[in-house]
Every structure is written in C-alpha cells, then in structure tokens.
C-alpha cells in the first residue's frame, strides 16, 4: 500500500463531522463516557457542553464488597463530576436528565441538580434515588410546563407534599413508592387531573388502603399499570374514569366498592385482584365451605369486573380467579368480546368460578393455563371442563 493511501486511510473522519451530529452521538453514551472523549483531541474538548442528554449513574460503583472509605470517595468524586458538568453546560437547553445515585440524610445537592435542569427546560426527567430516608420530591418537579416524561423511583418512599400541580405537556408518568402529605386521596386525583396530555401512568408500590378514596380520572390516558402493596386492608373506594384507556394492568386488594368504572375503549387487561389474608383464610376454611360460605365480607369486585367485560385479551392471576368466586356479589359478567384468556393456576386456589367464566366467554378462541412447573393437576382441569 502506498504512503498516499495510508495517509488517506488514517484520516480522522469522525472529528470532521458537524458539532450537532457529534453531540447527538454523545447523547447516547453515559455522561462519564461522553466526558472522557474530551481528551481525544482539541476538537472534542468542549462538545460535552452541548450534549442534550445527561445520563448520570454512581450506583454502578457502589458495590457491597467495596470498603466504606472507597464508597465515600467515589460518591464525593461523583458529586464533583456532576457539579462540573452542570457548570460546563450552563443554561444550554436539555432534553433528558437521568440520575441514579445514593444520597445520605441531606438531599440538597441532588435537589439542586434537579432544580437546575428544570430551569433549563428539561423534557424527560428520570430519577432513581437510593436513600435510607424519605426523599422529599422538590415541589417544582410537579409544576413544570416543559416535562413530557417523569419517572421517579428509589429504595425508600418519595414524599409529595404540595397542594398544586401543573404538568400540561406530561405524557408519561412513572412513580414508585410515593406517599402524599394529605392521605385522604385528593392530592393524587389532583395530580392526575393536572396532566392534561397524560397517556401512560405507571404506579408501583402504592399504599392507598387508608385513603378515603382513590380516583384515576383522565380522558387522555391510554395505558395504566398500578401495583398496590397493601394486603391487610381493603381499600375503601376505587374509581376509574378513563374512557380512552386501551391497556390496563391492575394489582390490588379488592376494594369495598368501585363507584365508577369507565373503560369504554379497553382492549387488554391484566387483573391481579386479591383478598386480604383473613378473607382468604375464611374462604378456604373447610368448615366455612361446608356451611355454605360463599362471599367474603367487606369487599365487592362485581362492579370492577363489569367494567372490564368488553376486553378482547385478558390475564387473570390465580388470586383474581378466587376473587370471582368469593367477592362478586353479582353474577360474573358476560365477556362477549373476549378472544384470548390466560389464567394463572395455583393448587391452593379455588377454581369454582372457572366453569361459569368460560360459559360467559361465548367467542373465546384461545385459552392458556399458566401452570407451575412443579405440578400439573390435569384431573382438576378435566373435572372443570366436564362441567362447562
């Protein structure tokens, strides 16, 4: 190969790309890696100042086997690194800010970063905060007109203690282990109603059994996933007014009542309703069964199940199947549109509602049983199918 061809082949083509394109490429890297490119050449030295996405994570360095002193040093250096990046970027527009970090008892440093990116008009905010204490979410997070996506999670509860919300552009909201200063339920309802463009709602580790009511009301919502941790108490009142919802994933203890259930557009539902441990004990007690015990006290899933009866695809947990037996004070509704049904099985759970459910699915095409790998009780299936 000639020296001329060698010289041509060794040209730094990437460095000759436009700044905007290079910054776009760097935006896909973790910020620590993007920052390391500044040593490649003078051309790269200040590109980080204009990268529109920041992905900051110090959890990858915080390993259990690492000594305490080393962990503290890494946390300190991480904070200094974030401070430098913030100073370098100044007030440049920011599209996404993702932060995973472990903090001590003082969250002011983290809150300062969050408030800074909010001032810069960030569109996507993704926070994972590992803390031994409740983390008070800065009120401004819930009063930001530029946010399109907000995801908040961590190792402990996040506290929302504000009375006003304003998130007019928010389309995606993911919250994990959130508690509200007012435990009555109104703040949660106000939060949802303040998100006029909301399309996806994910709530994990919710604890609303002590609320006076819980209401999910939004004409724009299309997908909802809610997983409630409470198991010992039945929620007092749960309502859904989501006429354009197409997908629902709902795990909760059966409520005392469901005053409003509006799922007019629902296509697919994954139902994980369950009874409290006391209700399960009473339901499975052979003496109670002998004396005709058929209904659990203090809970009624009938109105909720009536609300989902138009779905085309449905998944029922084994506990939800038992809820149909004991917690539906009205008859199990007819699922005229149901084509695909998946039922989780458990040898401890009552199957009495299954024959009725199948009779009430006149257009069912696919039936799948999720059977635990350690057991296959075909004799039970044969018995139930013989009665359908």
Swiss-Prot record:
The record ties this protein, via Pfam families, to:
F-box, LRR_At5g56370
> Metal-binding among the record's keywords?
no
* LRR repeat locations: 151-177, 180-205, 228-252, 313-345, 346-371
Keyword set, alphabetical order: Leucine-rich repeat, Repeat
**Location of the F-box domain:** 11-64
Q: Which PANTHER family match?
A: RNI-LIKE SUPERFAMILY PROTEIN
Instruction: Provide the protein name.
Output: F-box/LRR-repeat protein At3g59190
Per the UniProt entry, what species is this protein from, by scientific name? Arabidopsis thaliana (Mouse-ear cress)
Q: What does the record give as the organism's lineage?
A: Eukaryota, Viridiplantae, Streptophyta, Embryophyta, Tracheophyta
């Amino acid at each position: 190969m000639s020296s001329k061809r060698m010289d041509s082949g060794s040209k730094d083509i990437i460095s000759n790309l436009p700044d905007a394109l290079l910054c776009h490429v760097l935006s896909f890297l973790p910020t620590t890696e993007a920052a390391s490119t500044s040593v490649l050449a003078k051309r790269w030295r200040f590109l980080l100042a204009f990268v529109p996405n920041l992905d900051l994570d110090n959890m990858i360095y915080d390993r259990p086997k690492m000594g305490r002193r080393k962990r503290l040093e890494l946390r300190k250096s991480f904070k200094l690194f974030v401070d430098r990046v913030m100073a370098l970027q100044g007030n440049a527009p920011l599209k996404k800010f993702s932060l995973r970090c472990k903090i001590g008892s003082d969250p002011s440093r983290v809150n300062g970063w969050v408030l800074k990116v909010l001032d810069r008009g960030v569109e996507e905010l993704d926070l994972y905060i590992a803390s031994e204490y409740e983390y008070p979410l800065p009120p401004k997070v819930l009063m930001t007109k530029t946010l399109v996506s907000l995801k908040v999670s961590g190792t402990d509860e996040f506290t929302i203690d504000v009375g006003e919300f304003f998130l007019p552009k928010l389309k995606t909201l993911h919250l994990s282990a959130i508690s509200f200063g007012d435990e009555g339920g109104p703040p949660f309802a106000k939060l949802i109603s303040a998100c006029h463009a909301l399309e996806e709602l994910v709530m994990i580790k919710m604890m609303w059994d002590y609320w006076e009511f819980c209401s999910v009301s939004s004409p724009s919502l299309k997908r909802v996933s809610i997983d409630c941790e409470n198991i010992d108490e039945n929620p007092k009142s749960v309502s859904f007014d989501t006429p354009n919802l197409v997908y629902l994933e709902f795990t909760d203890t059966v409520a005392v009542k469901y005053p409003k259930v509006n799922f007019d557009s629902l296509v697919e539902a994954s139902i994980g309703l369950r009874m409290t441990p006391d209700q399960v004990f009473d339901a499975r007690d052979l003496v109670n069964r002998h004396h005709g015990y058929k209904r659990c006290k203090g809970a009624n899933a009938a109105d909720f199940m009536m609300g989902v009866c138009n779905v085309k695809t449905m998944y029922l947990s084994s506990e939800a199947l038992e809820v149909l037996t004991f917690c539906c004070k009205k008859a199990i509704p007819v699922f005229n549109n149901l084509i695909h049904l998946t039922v989780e099985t458990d040898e401890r759970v009552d199957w009495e509602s299954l024959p009725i459910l199948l009779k009430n699915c006149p257009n069912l095409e696919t039936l799948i049983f999720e059977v635990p790998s350690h057991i296959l009780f075909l004799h039970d299936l044969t018995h139930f199918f013989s009665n359908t």
